[in-house]
C-alpha cells in the first residue's frame, strides 16, 4: 500500500490546500463605555481614535470623538442617551464624520447625518462623501465677489447688496423678521431656477421647534422653492451634538455644489442656538469655560464654518489643486462656483455688543440689523439702515441698480437724522421739509409684504421714482398704491423697452424718459 503513495503528489495536494486557505481576518478596534451622561460618553480602549472620527455602537447609534485624553476618549452621541448603557461595546469606523450628498437630495428634509426626516424613503441616486469638517479654500483658490445674489427685497438689493460668495449676517431680536428675509431670498431664486441658472439653497434649522420647521417647509413647497432647496433640521428635541453639527452638514452640502461649478446659498438659522449647543457639549466634556461660560474656541467654531463660503477662481488648473479637496470630488471639480452664507444671530433686547453677536459681526462681510421698534411701526423688513452694511457694496450690484440706488442709503440715514430733529422744531426751511418728505416716501417704497420678492428690473424702476423726486405730488398714504399702478403700467406698456432693458443692467435716456412719463401719468390721479 505504501508503495502506491507518492511523496510529490502529497506535497502538491497539501500545497493546493494551503493556497486555498482564506487567511483574511477583519480587525475591529473596540472600546467599552465607562460613563454616559447628557449626550456624552466616555470610552476606554480606543487608543488610536482620531479627533472628529465617527464611532458606532452595536445598536446602530453613532457618536463623534471630541476629546482625546490619556486614559479615555470623550465622544458626543448622535442619538438618544437612554439607549446607551455603561459597559456597551463601541467600535471605530476609521472614517471622519461625513454626509453623502447628491442631486437627489433636492426637495428633501434631512438630519445632519443625511438621513431623511420627511417620510419619503431613502435618498437614492449617485451620492458623494463630503466631510462635515473641512478647511476653507485658501486665498489663491478664491476670486473677488462681483456677481449679485438678488434677494427680491428692495431695501436689501438697493442699500445692502449681497454678492455670490459673500457672508452676510442677519441679526436682530426674536420676532423681528430674520427668518422671513432668508425665506424670501430662497423663494426669489425660483426665477434663476426657471432660467436654467439655479442657485441651490440649503436651509439649516438649528434648535427650532419641529412645528416651525414643518411650517417653513410647507411655505417653500407652496412657492415652488423646494425644487432647488434642501432642508437640514436639528430640532430642539434632538441631542445637542446634532444641533452643533447641523451647520457643518449644511456647509458640506453647499460645498458639493460650489466645487462642481454651481452656485449655492446656505442659511444658518440660527448660530446663537449652535453656540449654546456647543457650550452644553463642552461643559459636559469638562472643557475650560470662558466668557458667558462659552468655551475658549467659540470664535474659531464660527470662523471656520463661515470661511467655507467662497467664490471659486475661474482657472481650472488652480481650482483642481484646491486644498483639502475630498477624494469623492477629485475628477469632477469645476470652476466658477460659489457658496453664499446667510448666518442668523438672535440678540437680547437689541444688544449687538454681546459676545456671540460681536464675534459673528467681525467674521462676516456685513450685517443686516433688524429692529423691534421699526417692526412694530409697520416698517417691514425692519432694517435699521444706519448700522446695516455690506462690505462688498456696489461690486455686487448690476450697473443700473448701482446708478439708481447709489445715494439711497445716505439719503435715508440723513432723513432719519432730520426727522429726529424736526420733532423739536415746528418751523422748517423748504429744503429740510423736502428732504423729510422724500425720505418718508422712500421709506414707504421700501416696505414690502412677506413672500412677495420683486424682480430686480421692477425694483430699479420704482426706486428711480423715489430717488429722483417723482413722488413729490403723491400723498404719503398713496405711495404703495402708486407703486402698484406704476409697475402694472410698465408691464402693460413698456415690458420690452424698459423692464427687459433694465434686467440687463442698462439704464439710458430712453429708459429714464419712459419711467418719468409713466410716473407722471400715474401720479396725475392723486392731484
UniProtKB/Swiss-Prot annotation:
One of its GO terms (cellular component) is plasma membrane. GO terms for biological process: proton motive force-driven ATP synthesis. Disulfide bonds: none annotated. ATP binds at residues 172-179. It is a peripheral membrane protein. The record marks 388 as: Required for activity. It is found in: Cell inner membrane. It catalyses: ATP + H2O + 4 H(+)(in) = ADP + phosphate + 5 H(+)(out). One of its GO terms (molecular function) is ATP binding. InterPro entries: ATP_synth_asu-like_sf, ATP_synth_asu_C, ATP_synth_asu_C_sf, ATP_synth_F1_a_nt-bd_dom, ATP_synth_F1_asu, ATPase_a/bsu_AS, ATPase_F1/V1/A1_a/bsu_N, ATPase_F1/V1/A1_a/bsu_N_sf. It is an enzyme of class 7 (translocase). PROSITE patterns: ATPASE_ALPHA_BETA (PS00152). Its EC number is 7.1.2.2. Keywords: ATP synthesis, ATP-binding, Cell inner membrane, Cell membrane, CF(1), Hydrogen ion transport, Ion transport, Membrane, Nucleotide-binding, Translocase, Transport. HAMAP family: ATP_synth_alpha_bact. F-type ATPases have 2 components, CF(1) - the catalytic core - and CF(0) - the membrane proton channel. CF(1) has five subunits: alpha(3), beta(3), gamma(1), delta(1), epsilon(1). CF(0) has three main subunits: a(1), b(2) and c(9-12). The alpha and beta chains form an alternating ring which encloses part of the gamma chain. CF(1) is attached to CF(0) by a central stalk formed by the gamma and epsilon chains, while a peripheral stalk is formed by the delta and b chains. Produces ATP from ADP in the presence of a proton gradient across the membrane. The alpha chain is a regulatory subunit. PANTHER family: ATP SYNTHASE SUBUNIT ALPHA, MITOCHONDRIAL. Belongs to the ATPase alpha/beta chains family. This is ATP synthase subunit alpha. It comes from Bacteroides thetaiotaomicron (strain ATCC 29148 / DSM 2079 / JCM 5827 / CCUG 10774 / NCTC 10582 / VPI-5482 / E50). The lineage of its organism: Bacteria, Pseudomonadati, Bacteroidota, Bacteroidia, Bacteroidales. The gene is atpA.
Amino acid at each position: 500500500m505504501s508503495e502506491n503513495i507518492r511523496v510529490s503528489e502529497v506535497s502538491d495536494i497539501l500545497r493546493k490546500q494551503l493556497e486555498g486557505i482564506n487567511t483574511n481576518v477583519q480587525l475591529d478596534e473596540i472600546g467599552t463605555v465607562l460613563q454616559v451622561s447628557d449626550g456624552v460618553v466616555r470610552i476606554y480602549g480606543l487608543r488610536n481614535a482620531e479627533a472628529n472620527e465617527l464611532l458606532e455602537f452595536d445598536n446602530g447609534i453613532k457618536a463623534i470623538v471630541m476629546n482625546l485624553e490619556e486614559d479615555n476618549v470623550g465622544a458626543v452621541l448622535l442619538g438618544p442617551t437612554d439607549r446607551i448603557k455603561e459597559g456597551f461595546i463601541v467600535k471605530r469606523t476609521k472614517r471622519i464624520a461625513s454626509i453623502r450628498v447628491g442631486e437627489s437630495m433636492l426637495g428633501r428634509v434631512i438630519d445632519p447625518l443625511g438621513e431623511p426626516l420627511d417620510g419619503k424613503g431613502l435618498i437614492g441616486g449617485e451620492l458623494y462623501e463630503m466631510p462635515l469638517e473641512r478647511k476653507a479654500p485658501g486665498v489663491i483658490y478664491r476670486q473677488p465677489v462681483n456677481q449679485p445674489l438678488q434677494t427680491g427685497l428692495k431695501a436689501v438689493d438697493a442699500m445692502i447688496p449681497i454678492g455670490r460668495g459673500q457672508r452676510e449676517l442677519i441679526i436682530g431680536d426674536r420676532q423681528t423678521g430674520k427668518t422671513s428675509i432668508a425665506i424670501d431670498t430662497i423663494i426669489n431664486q425660483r426665477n434663476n431656477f426657471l432660467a436654467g441658472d439655479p442657485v441651490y439653497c440649503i436651509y439649516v434649522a438649528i434648535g427650532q421647534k419641529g412645528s416651525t420647521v414643518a411650517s417653513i417647509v410647507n411655505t417653500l413647497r407652496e412657492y415652488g422653492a423646494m425644487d432647488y432647496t434642501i432642508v437640514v433640521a436639528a430640532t430642539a428635541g434632538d441631542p445637542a451634538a446634532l444641533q452643533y453639527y447641523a451647520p457643518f452638514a449644511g456647509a458640506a452640502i453647499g460645498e458639493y455644489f460650489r466645487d462642481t461649478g454651481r452656485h449655492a446659498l446656505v442659511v444658518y438659522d440660527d448660530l446663537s442656538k449652535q453656540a449654546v449647543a456647543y457650550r452644553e457639549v463642552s461643559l459636559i466634556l469638562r472643557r475650560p469655560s470662558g466668557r458667558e461660560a462659552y468655551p475658549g474656541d467659540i470664535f474659531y467654531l464660527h470662523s471656520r464654518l463661515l470661511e467655507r463660503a467662497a467664490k471659486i477662481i475661474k482657472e481650472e488648473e488652480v481650482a483642481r489643486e484646491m486644498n483639502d479637496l475630498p477624494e469623492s470630488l477629485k475628477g469632477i471639480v469645476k470652476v466658477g462656483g460659489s457658496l453664499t452664507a446667510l448666518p442668523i444671530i438672535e440678540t437680547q433686547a437689541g444688544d449687538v455688543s454681546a459676545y456671540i453677536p460681536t464675534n459673528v459681526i467681525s467674521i462676516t462681510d456685513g450685517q443686516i440689523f433688524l429692529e423691534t421698534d421699526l417692526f412694530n411701526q409697520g416698517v417691514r423688513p425692519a432694517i435699521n439702515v444706519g448700522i446695516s452694511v455690506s462690505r462688498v457694496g456696489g461690486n455686487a450690484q448690476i450697473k443700473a441698480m448701482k446708478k439708481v440706488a447709489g445715494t439711497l442709503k445716505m439719503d435715508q440715514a440723513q432723513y432719519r437724522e432730520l426727522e429726529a430733529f424736526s420733532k423739536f422744531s415746528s418751523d422748517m426751511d423748504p429744503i429740510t421739509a423736502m428732504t423729510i418728505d422724500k425720505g418718508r416716501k422712500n421709506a414707504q417704497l421700501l416696505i414690502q409684504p412677506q413672500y412677495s420678492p420683486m424682480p430686480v428690473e421692477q425694483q430699479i424702476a420704482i426706486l428711480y421714482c423715489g430717488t429722483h423726486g417723482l413722488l413729490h405730488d403723491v400723498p404719503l398714504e398713496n405711495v404703495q398704491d402708486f407703486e402698484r399702478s406704476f409697475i402694472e403700467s410698465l408691464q402693460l406698456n413698456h415690458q420690452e423697452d424698459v423692464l427687459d432693458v433694465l434686467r440687463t443692467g442698462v439704464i439710458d435716456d430712453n429708459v429714464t424718459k419712459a419711467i418719468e412719463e409713466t410716473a407722471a401719468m400715474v401720479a396725475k390721479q392723486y392731484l
